[in-house]
Structure formats: C-alpha cells, structure tokens
From Swiss-Prot:
Keyword check for Nucleus: no
GO CC terms of this entry: chloroplast
Keywords: Chloroplast, Plastid, Repeat, TPR repeat
Record's keyword annotation contains Repeat: yes
Protein name according to UniProt: Uncharacterized protein ycf37
InterPro entries noted in UniProt: TPR-like_helical_dom_sf (IPR011990), TPR_rpt (IPR019734)
Family indicated by similarity: Belongs to the ycf37 family.
TPR repeat feature ranges: 52-89, 95-128, 129-162
Organism of origin: Pyropia yezoensis (Susabi-nori)
C-alpha cells in the first residue's frame, strides 16, 4: 500500500515525459525537414535557374521560415516563369501564386500590397475561396466590415460549410451588435 502511491506518481510522470518527448521529436523532425528543403533550394538556385514549380515550392519554404523578402522574390520569379509558359491550366497556378504573394505581404504587415495581390488572384479566378477569405480578412483589418461581410457571403454561396467564413461572419455580426 505504501509503495502504490509513489509508483502511481512515477507512472504518471513517465507517461507525461514520454508524450513530451514525442512532441519534441515531432517538432525537431519538422524543423530539420524544413531546413533541409531550404538548403536544397538555396544550393540548387546558386547552381542553376529554378523551374517555376521549384520557385513556388521554395517560396513556400521561405514563408514557413518567415523569410518574407526571399519568399517575395521567389514568388515573383515563379509568377513570371508561369506567365511565360502559356499553358491552359496556368490560370489556377497563377491565381495560387497571387494569393500566396498576398499572404506573404499580409504576414509582412503590408496590407495594401496584399490586397492588390488578392484582387489579382480574384480577377483570374473570381470563385477562389481562399483568396476571398484572405481579402475579407484585410477588409476586417481596415475596419470595412460591410465589404468583409459581403465577401464572406460570397464564400458561403460557393461553399456553405466554410468554417472560416462562418466563424468570421458571426464575429462581424457580434461586433455590429455591440
């Protein structure tokens, strides 16, 4: 009976430490993968010009590492290269690139540039739900709640189950009622 309580506490501590160890290991694995991808793209870009899809992937890695200036450069390069290819399915990729560049500028705190890129993505694909959500978020940031709400309404007409649009629209409605 006397040994049962310490054994119980040690068991709980061991389980907690095992879970913590697993979480740290997963985080380290993610960091090492990101670093190896970044090193791969840096080495490859120094030796030769990256393909458009490689520039796009490199820009995504740079965003994950919060290297926004490098991500903007690579994103612009990928955009230029995709425009030069003249492939029919390019419009979807170009809209994705515009949206990604908008996201990068938004994360860097430059909302006016971000807004322009989101609008360009929507000119190419007016039903691009992610770009609509992102543009609505910018309108929320600048306190233009009517435009934000109308964009969220458009998102919900395209995708009724969009959690982001539902949540943000409810938030705007609560904000208006205060």
């Amino acid at each position: 009976m006397i040994l049962a309580l310490p054994i119980f506490y040690l068991s709980i501590l061991t389980i907690f430490l095992l879970i913590l160890n697993w979480l740290i290991f997963q985080q380290l694995k993610t960091i090492l993968l990101l670093e190896s991808q970044f090193k791969y793209f840096v080495d490859k870009s120094q030796n030769r010009k990256l393909e458009p899809d490689e520039s796009f992937a490199f820009a995504k890695v740079c965003v994950a590492k919060k290297y926004f200036s490098k991500a903007i450069i690579e994103g612009q390069l990928a955009l230029k290269n995709y425009r030069d290819l003249n492939i029919l399915d390019n419009n979807i990729v170009i809209a994705n690139l515009y949206n990604m560049l908008g996201f990068i500028y938004f994360e860097a705190g430059q909302t006016s540039f971000a807004k322009n890129f989101y609008e360009q993505a929507l000119q190419i694909n007016p039903n691009y739900v992610v770009a609509l959500n992102n543009l609505a978020k910018i309108y929320e940031e600048v306190k233009d709640l009517k435009k934000a709400e109308s964009l969220y309404d458009k998102v919900l007409t395209l995708n009724l189950n969009n959690k982001t649009a539902n949540r943000r629209k409810d938030f705007i409605a609560k904000t208006k009622n205060i």
